Amino acid sequence: MKILIQDELAWVSATVTFQGRTITFENVLLDTGSSGCIFPAHRMEEIDFTPEPLSPVFNIQGVGGKEPVFMRLIDVVMVGEFRIENFMIEVGAMKYDFPIDGIIGLDFLLAVKASIDLDKLELRSV
C-alpha cells in the first residue's frame, strides 16, 4: 500500500467492519509512536459501534494533550492488504488541530507484521 507524506506525516486509508457494516477512513495517520489504533466516535457511530456497558474507558496522551477513549473489539481492521480480525481499538472524540480520520498504531503494524519502506513510501509484508 502506498503511503502519502503530507505535512511531514505518513498517511494511509483504513477500513473497519463491525457486525457486517463497513466504513472507510481516507485520512489515517500511520504512527509508530502510538501504541494503539484510534478512530473518531462520531464516525464509528455510523456503523453502530458504540461503547458497551463494561467497555474500559481511560485517558490517552499524545502531542495534542489528553483525551478520554473507550476500548472495544472490532470485527475487522484493514489497511491495504493487511487485515486483522477481532482487534481491540480505541474510540474517542479526536478533536485535533488538523484533519484526521484515525490513527493506525504500532499494535496493528506488529500484529500484521508490516514493514514500512520509507524509500518507496510503501507499507509492505515482511
Residue ranges, per PLM feature:
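Pepsin/retropepsin-fold aspartyl endopeptidases
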Residues: 1-126
